Amino acid sequence: MSFIHLHVHSYYSFHDGAASPAGLIEKAKHFGMPVLALTDHNRLTGAIRFYDLAEKSGIKPIIGAEIDMEGDYHLTLLCKDMAGYSSLCRLLTAMHCSKCSDRPMATRDMLDRHHEGLIALSGCRLGEIPTLLSRGDMD
């Protein structure tokens, strides 16, 4: 079984990623990875280019995003299908149009409304689960 990266940032995740979508595809191909996800912060800026380049390179692309959630947590979302892509687009639009914060942020209500076709990962070290566990909160 091959290793698959499900949480990858490109240079569209400012201060968090340095590679272009094309560079990510090139490295994945070099290492024989059959699948690769792109999960930039709060945006899908490189998603279409990434998808097209991955398919042309014989790599199965997974589109997603790492979003900022209320409570100052991160949540990584992957699109399972076109319904997931549509849900993620609607969620990101709602986040960017919301006046909840000085930066795009999702509320649980937004996620409840726009979740069809999405897969949620437990997240990076700034995810809700890792943060609560690091505080000793096991409930």
Describe each model-derived feature in a short phrase.
Residues M1-D139:
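Phosphodiester-processing cores and adjacent nucleic acid-binding clamps
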